[in-house]
Regions:
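Beta-rich strand-turn-strand
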Residues: 53-88
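Acidic, gly/ser/pro-rich intrinsically disordered tails
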Residues: 1-2, 22, 40-43, 86, ...
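Core FKBP-type peptidyl-prolyl cis-trans isomerase
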Residues: 4-45, 89
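Residue-level recognition of specific faces of alpha-helices
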Residues: 4, 28-30, 49, 59, ...
Length: 130
């Protein structure tokens, strides 16, 4: 039997590096992945939770940011945990490797465009009569 996941998508938020009680580095993050098909003229998006450990977690937290385009290679995992006396199950991708798919220059352009969009939105709101 074989369990392999390959995803290409954008990070929903900047990955934050954390440490476990046993001092292991971990990053939990969400990847926005477009579906192949369109139902209403626009692609639907799946938000897939993933986790990276150790040096891989440190590298991801250091070099990736919100909106970064990356490919991820890993395996699907399920886990069970208890929260307030209730048993919960989670499914996530355990990341074995990743690759950033945009250069620093491309990332700077994307971030600059996002900042300009926010400025334009603020200017439009100033024109509102109320």
């Amino acid at each position: 039997m074989y369990n392999k996941v390959i995803l290409i998508g954008r990070l929903v938020a900047k990955p934050e590096l954390n440490k476990t009680l046993t001092d292991k580095q971990v990053v939990r993050f969400t990847l926005a992945v477009n579906r192949r098909f369109k139902t209403t003229g626009e692609r639907e998006v799946d938000f897939i939770n993933a986790v990276a450990w150790g040096g891989l977690a440190e590298t991801l937290a250091s070099y990736a940011s919100k909106g970064s385009l990356l490919s991820l290679d890993g395996e699907l995992r399920t886990r069970k945990y208890d929260k307030a006396g209730q048993t919960h199950f989670a499914t996530e991708v355990l990341c074995h490797s990743f690759q950033l798919l945009e250069s620093r220059a491309q990332r700077a352009i994307r971030e600059n465009n996002a900042a300009n969009d926010l400025i334009d939105l603020a200017l439009e709101e100033e024109k509102l009569p109320f």
